């Protein structure tokens, strides 16, 4: 396959993902989301978002963020400025692998800074590849669908997870997002 055909195929995936998202939103389809939009989302200004980001308790080494202790705090953001769409960022690393102790309580803060889309930060044992219209089950913890940020503010929410040892994945279940790379791995040991 020549380069031009590869580019057309790649662009076609984004078009299909976008059309799927529009169709799902228009028809009110929620099967792609872990849970429906809820009221636990709070709003934050950019300075407040920056203050939230520094609360992550992990240490970065390459493409891995390692956590230690009985309680860890993971702060993930969707599409921070300077990062490609769609992606998660943790400690300024795109879709890093998270290394978490099995006996830890994991407090997660998820921030949506992407003004054009809602996102989700959901945890599953199902690994990639992911479909354009995902129906990833089971979701063991997560945020569900976020509101689209408006009025110069960003949305964020928190949840707590008590994992057992194993391999998990954090994913965005908005149609097309995980299929085009908005996911990462979690190793709990």
Model-derived regions, located:
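Metallo-beta-lactamase
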Residues: 51-60, 65-77
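Histidine- and aromatic-enriched segments that form or immediately flank copper-ligand environments
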Residues: 85-86, 116-151, 178-181
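Extracellular/periplasmic metallocenter environments
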Residues: 35-59, 143-189
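N-terminal edge beta-strand
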Residues: 67-105
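Beta-strand cores of secreted/periplasmic/IMS beta-sandwich domains, seen most often
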Residues: 60-67, 94-122, 156-164, 168, ...
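N-terminal secretory signal peptides that target proteins for export/translocation
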Residues: 1-11
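Sec/Tat signal peptide C-region and signal peptidase I cleavage site
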Residues: 29-34
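Bacterial N-terminal signal peptides
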Residues: 18-28
């Amino acid at each position: 396959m020549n380069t031009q055909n590869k580019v057309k195929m790649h662009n076609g995936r984004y078009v299909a993902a976008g059309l799927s998202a529009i169709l799902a939103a228009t028809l009110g389809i929620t099967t792609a989301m872990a849970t429906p939009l809820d009221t636990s989302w709070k709003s934050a200004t950019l300075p407040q978002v920056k203050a939230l980001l520094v609360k992550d308790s992990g240490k970065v080494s390459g493409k891995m963020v390692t956590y230690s202790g009985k309680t860890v705090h993971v702060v993930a953001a969707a599409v921070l400025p300077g990062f490609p769409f769609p992606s998660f960022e943790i400690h300024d690393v795109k879709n890093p692998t998270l290394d978490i102790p099995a006996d830890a309580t994991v407090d997660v803060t998820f921030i949506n800074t992407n003004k054009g889309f809602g996102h989700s930060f959901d945890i599953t044992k199902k690994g990639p590849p992911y479909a354009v219209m995902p129906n990833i089950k089971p979701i063991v913890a997560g945020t569900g669908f976020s509101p689209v940020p408006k009025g110069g503010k960003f949305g964020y929410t928190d949840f707590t997870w008590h994992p057992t040892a194993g391999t998990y994945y954090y994913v965005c279940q908005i149609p097309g997002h995980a299929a085009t790379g908005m996911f990462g791995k979690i190793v709990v040991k």
